[in-house]
């Protein structure tokens, strides 16, 4: 448990009761089929033997042209129409570029990984789609898997795919693992997996650096309560680490109650620097233990971990928020490069709100308030536009200061819209009359809100 639980204002248990989450419903891309009933479909469990048999049958079954439909009770011999749905495995082998696999709602129980193979690609302007049908909620449930690094949930090794509106839980390793490039992952929820909820990395140990996943967009997604049962130091909310290329973006994503970090952008000496990652409009809170209190002494608990092994990578973090994480809000984690942080807010984290001990980092319009330890800000404080927390008080070279009165509310309230977007209400929003409004450079406010 957090050592700070005795603080009635900020204690983990007290806050957990005050934060409400509204899970997003899926959105259909394209036509809304209002004439088709949204019935509750039964669950089905596929063993490894059944998956193998399904794959064999799928190879000999020609599915309907165009969009395909799958359901928990779909049959591999069905053509994949809405009235006669097929299986997910069969649909993945035959969907054409520019077409969509629609998943009906219900529980899809698997004991082995669902893989979109290398070479199973869409194209620029003609993505292959794996999308929840209407407002229904398809749940890919891998709880039957054993804990182990080979037991991922959904593994996307192909390029140019849209994955939207899915819930993925219980995997023996990562919930979703992305080894392909130019994919769009939207409004997904990954939780209670036994490693990072959603991770990017090379599809094979033999993949060259030019094949590392690049130009993927993770949008409006939520990753929570992921925990590895062996040591509690591996399972993050989101990770683009070890073996990722350039151009990967996280936008409007939420990471909470993961046993290790919210985001992990770790580089390792053995594999060298990763490509620069961009994080926008995202929130990390209460990482370092799960919502039921699971943690270990090894659980780091950073909101945004932005490096590793003293390797330079110039990441970008903008308009993002870290609060009440076990350790740091934003940390360079030994990355001595030039990380650019713009209009971020960090509040009440277990150690420093901003921990950048070394490097040539660039800080613009960031706001730190009520950290447990002083901020460390090696680099350029552009135009003295940042308000830091040092020696238990705010500091700014131009005389700006932050107090509780500068915020409409310091009571966390987080919901998600139907599209998965984060809704914060008045939480950490600057109050009318605050001198932080309009004091940014070259214009605008200081902080994320």
From Swiss-Prot:
Lipid positions (N-palmitoyl cysteine): 27
Ways its activity is controlled: Activated in presence of the surfactant polysorbate 20, while inhibited in the presence of polysorbate 40, polysorbate 60, polysorbate 80, Triton X-100 and sodium dodecyl sulfate. Inhibited by the metal chelator ethylenediaminetetraacetic acid (EDTA). Inhibited by iron and cobalt ions.
Mention one GO molecular function.
metal ion binding
Active site, renumbered: 305 (proton acceptor)
Cofactor(s) required for function per UniProt = Ca(2+)
What are the protein's UniProt keywords? Answer: Calcium, Lipoprotein, Lyase, Metal-binding, Palmitate, Repeat, Secreted, Signal
Q: What does this protein do?
A: Presents an endo-cleaving activity on the homogalacturonan (HG) region in pectin with a preference for low- or unmethylated pectin.
Its family remark reads: Belongs to the polysaccharide lyase 9 family.
Q: What is this protein called?
A: Pectate lyase L
User: Gene of origin?
Assistant: pel9A
